[in-house]
C-alpha cells in the first residue's frame, strides 16, 4: 500500500503528527514546511541502511520536529544528525565519549534525544548531562 502524500500534507497542515515511510516518501520539503507552520511532528520510519548524511538533509528542514524511528549508535554520524535537529534514540552501550557533545548538540539544535544503555555513566554524570541538556535529553 502506498502512502497518500496529499493526506499526509493535509494532516500536517492541520497540526496532526504523522509517520512517513522513508522509502515511499515524496516531496519532503513540503511536509517539513507544513510541519514548521503547524507545529506538527514527523516520524520517519523504514530508514535502516540510510546514510546519516542523507538523514541530516531531511531533519535539518524542520529541526526538533523530525523523529527518526530507529536506535542509533553513539558515534560521529549520529552526532551530526543531532546537530541538524533530529529527534532520536541513541544507544550508549559502548560507553561513547561523545555523549557530552551529543547533549550539547541536542540543546543547541532543538533536537530531543533519548539515551539508552548508559550503564557506564554514574548517576552523578547522568544528572550533570540532564542539567546540561534540559528538556532536550532523557536517559532510560
Predicted feature locations:
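General marker for long, soluble alpha-helical cores
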Residues: 1-140
